[in-house]
Amino acid sequence: MKIGVIAIQGAVSEHVDALRRALAERGVEAEVVEIKHKGIVPECSGIVIPGGESTTLCRLLAREGIGEEIKEAAARGVPVLGTCAGLIVLAKEGDRQVEKTGQELLGIMDTRVNRNAFGRQRDSFEAELDVVILDSPFTGVFIRAPGIISCGPGVRVLSRLEDMIIAAEQGNVLALAFHPELTDDLRIHQYFLNKVLSC
């Protein structure tokens, strides 16, 4: 089994490390690979789109042909996790700022996103979050974080902060406004692995 982390931009090594630790906790053998070019996504049983700069990320995904591969994989039921900028990339629709920058969103999740819902880089913060899929609060690390303004009927809201949706899932696709990979808490990566292992 192979799990891929999109490695063209963003917090890549942290996700790779978190996934490897989560797999080790379970005693499951799987390869965690960095995806830097076309052709690797179709081999993966799970895909992670990390945080970073969403405009750059969207452009590189389109240019490298990786974006189309992610769309095809998600349509086949392959679990996909997007964090921070990854939440934006997965969305069907963006706010005016997203439209202005001409970002090519993948449209995998029936969501409309606010690109800088929680401010810019200097407004980074941590918050204790109630997340539906977890039995106790999770420390969310927010860095120039986006948020989900609205979502379609097929989307399950997992967490909110200040009336903004910050975590949601739609079938095999999971999107988070925060960075679970920047904490030692592996529960969200374990939840994602549950999806991967049950496919």
From Swiss-Prot:
Q: List the EC numbers from the record.
A: 4.3.3.6, 3.5.1.2
UniProt keyword Lyase, yes or no = yes
Q: Which GO terms describe its biological process?
A: glutamine catabolic process; pyridoxal phosphate biosynthetic process; pyridoxine metabolic process
Cell cycle among the record's keywords? no
PROSITE patterns per record: PDXT_SNO_1, PDXT_SNO_2
Q: Which GO terms describe its molecular function?
A: glutaminase activity; pyridoxal 5'-phosphate synthase (glutamine hydrolysing) activity
- The protein depicted here goes by the name Pyridoxal 5'-phosphate synthase subunit PdxT
What PANTHER family does its record include? PYRIDOXAL 5'-PHOSPHATE SYNTHASE SUBUNIT SNO, PYRIDOXAL 5'-PHOSPHATE SYNTHASE SUBUNIT SNO1-RELATED
Q: Which Gene3D superfamilies match?
A: 3.40.50.880
Protein's pathway: Cofactor biosynthesis; pyridoxal 5'-phosphate biosynthesis
Looking up InterPro entries in the UniProt record yields: Class_I_gatase-like, PdxT/SNO, PdxT/SNO_CS
A Pfam family per the record: SNO
Q: Which residues form the signal peptide?
A: none
So which domain of life are we looking at? Answer: Archaea
Q: Which UniProt keywords apply?
A: Glutamine amidotransferase, Hydrolase, Lyase, Pyridoxal phosphate
